[in-house]
Amino acid sequence: MTFLPLLFIFFFLTSIPFPAFSQYNDRSTLLNLKRDLGDPLSLRLWNDTSSPCNWPRITCTAGNVTEINFQNQNFTGTVPTTICNFPNLKSLNLSFNYFAGEFPTVLYNCTKLQYLDLSQNLFNGSLPDDINRLAPKLKYLDLAANSFAGDIPKNIGRISKLKVLNLYMSEYDGTFPSEIGDLSELEELQLALNDKFTPVKLPTEFGKLKKLKYMWLEEMNLIGEISAVVFENMTDLKHVDLSVNNLTGRIPDVLFGLKNLTELYLFANDLTGEIPKSISAKNLVHLDLSANNLNGSIPESIGNLTNLELLYLFVNELTGEIPRAIGKLPELKELKLFTNKLTGEIPAEIGFISKLERFEVSENQLTGKLPENLCHGGKLQSVIVYSNNLTGEIPESLGDCETLSSVLLQNNGFSGSVTISNNTRSNNNFTGKIPSFICELHSLILLDLSTNKFNGSIPRCIANLSTLEVLNLGKNHLSGSIPENISTSVKSIDIGHNQLAGKLPRSLVRISSLEVLNVESNKINDTFPFWLDSMQQLQVLVLRSNAFHGSINQNGFSKLRIIDISGNHFNGTLPLDFFVNWTAMFSLGKIEDQYMGTNYMRTNYYSDSIVVMIKGIALEMVRILNTFTTIDFSGNKFEGEIPRSVGLLKELHVLNLSNNGFTGHIPSSMGNLIELESLDVSQNKLSGEIPPELGKLSYLAYMNFSQNQFVGLVPGGTQFQTQPCSSFADNPRLFGLSLERVCVDIHKKTPQQSEMPEPEEDEEEVMNWTAAAIGSIPGISIGLTMGYILVSYKPEWLMNSGRNKRRIKPI
């Protein structure tokens, strides 16, 4: 009686399709995996009532789960042990998550894997020596952008079916194995951005990778010469990047003989010799040999690279002329040859055929005229040709070029006049009015016309430059008033050293992003702009040498680090709590040193600069450290006591209150100014004793107490003993050991002693100075500059050596 029911059950079960069983098993396993992952919301559609082959992030083949894609799911913890409980799993992507811990050897159980991506996680520790226990048919292995350390194990070379191996951007601090060369099927190798690798030559064993198409070995501490043996059999190679290493010697000819090569990056090494003359890699699109020590001439054969879009040869020792054939490259977009020793004229053909976007040949010895057709293709964005021997007129076509955002022409020999767009005349001295065509450059980010001889008023149409971040019109002959409605995107305004009059426009208060405002040495007649205290980003305020007047009774500049209101007509007393809100000078906290202005435009093309009085000398600070702080109230008519709240400014470096009418004592709270380097309170009506607390300020190298009414002992301490006599002059009731040692010319009653020589000033460690008494060096005309234009040009390559960090978190 039991035989027939059993037989019925057997036939029933065998009649059910096998994929249905497989899906049932996989569904159960997937639900367990979901549980192990903490039941994330992104897997909410996984349930026990639907087929797993219809679930998101799951792919099936013939009813079997063959692919799991958990990319960018914000998963945390360790990789679940259930991840390999799918007998037909071929592809597993766990990238862009927060999985942590050591390499998950549980993946050894995924025996049919062909694709494994663990990149962009938090894995650490060393890769296991037996990593070759991964699936024998594995073709794609990506472990990049984790925190793996130590050596890359030799056995990685035994995963014999690999076509792609990505190990870039981790913390490896050992070696990478030459056994990688045993991966005969490998097509893509990325070991880049691992600068902690032990220095090593490029292994000749890599020459066995005959199927390799993509080689990215940037910034991984490679040394020695590039061996031709490595590349002579890589006939399929399309991309080679060996940049930012310490490679030496000549560039092997074999690299320029790779007929499938489209991109070659060798920049920022120590390569020498000439560029190979024969170039048969006719498919090259990008060629970057910049920042080496290459010499000789630019090969004429580069003119045969008809697919070339980018040619970077800057910062080398190249000589000779620019080959005319380069001007005939039909696809050329970027030509950067700056900082070499190139001579001759710029080929007139450049820009006429191609859709040229960037043309940079500054700091050479080029002569002749600028080509007329640079913007013929209608795509030109930058023309940077400063510091050459160029002459003639500036082409009208530059004025008509609507896409142009960057022009640097200074330090050349341009002459004559030029009509630009609206008959505005300018020449190499750049006199006359500011051309209004500038206002039509709607993508303009930085406008620097400083140190010229422009006259007339500032064009009101500047208000139309909605993307402008830097406006520098300083050191010209501009007159009239400051325009209203300057772009609210501006971060830095420098209109100092002109003849501007009137008042500061109240519309400035709308520029909430403003960090620097410099209007020094004009004829502005206004009261103190207390209304600027609502600008939460304002760090530098320079009003010196104008006709500002009135009292200053309120101040709430929380971010202010540099304020110079010297040489005006301010008066009245300063409240005792005047400095209470200047919190940026209380403590800078832990911030990284950088120069102001280098964050503008998302590049490092520009740095703010100002003139400050320090140690009694006017100095031009060509770059401003974000940790530098100074207060200069000198040359006004302030009265009353110095506010005690000045002692709160523990990060203050320079304090100048000289040439006012301050009375009373120097507040002892100044002894709290532990970073103070320069103190000038001369030419006031201060009385009492000099606070002994000042003698404990170890950085205080310069002090000036002259022309006051101080009495009593001068404090001891090295700082006081090394000051010149002039620092204490015209205080007849001062006396003490310090004066007896160095100031016998003032105090005749002290024993005759030899005057101590004035010590040389220590080199400033926190500032990069161009020191000069103001007016002692004639200004240098730097020319008409637009777009990414700067006082001290810093090539982009120096700031963006990591340009090949291609992998970013997906949206």
UniProtKB/Swiss-Prot annotation:
Keyword line: Cell membrane, Glycoprotein, Leucine-rich repeat, Membrane, Plant defense, Receptor, Repeat, Signal, Transmembrane, Transmembrane helix
Listed GO CC annotations: plasma membrane
Segments on the Cytoplasmic side according to the record's topology features: 792-811
Compartment annotation: Cell membrane
Pfam families in the cross-refs: LRR_1 (PF00560), LRR_8 (PF13855), LRRNT_2 (PF08263)
Glycan attachment positions: 47, 64, 74, 93, 109, 124, 233, 246, 260, 295, 304, 389, 422, 429, 455, 464, 485, 525, 571, 581, 656, 704
Membrane topology: Single-pass type I membrane protein
Loss of function: phenotype: Enhanced susceptibility to pathogen powdery mildew E.cichoracearum.
Gene3D superfamilies for this protein: Ribonuclease Inhibitor
Protein origin, superkingdom: Eukaryota
Extracellular topological domain residue ranges: 23-770
Membrane-spanning intervals of the chain: 771-791
Signal peptide: 1-22
Gene Ontology terms: biological process: defense response to fungus; response to chitin
Cited SUPFAM superfamilies: L domain-like
The UniProt record lists the keyword NAD: no
Induction statement: By chitin.
LRR repeats: 62-86, 87-110, 112-134, 135-159, 161-183, 184-208, 211-233, 234-258, 260-281, 282-305, 307-329, 330-354, 356-377, 379-401, 403-427, 441-465, 466-489, 491-511, 512-537, 539-557, 558-581, 625-649, 650-673, 674-697, 699-722
Free-text function comment from the UniProt entry: Required for defense against powdery mildew pathogen.
Family: Belongs to the RLP family.
PANTHER family noted in UniProt: LEUCINE-RICH REPEAT RECEPTOR-LIKE PROTEIN KINASE FAMILY PROTEIN-RELATED, OS06G0557100 PROTEIN
Name of the protein this chain belongs to: Receptor-like protein 52
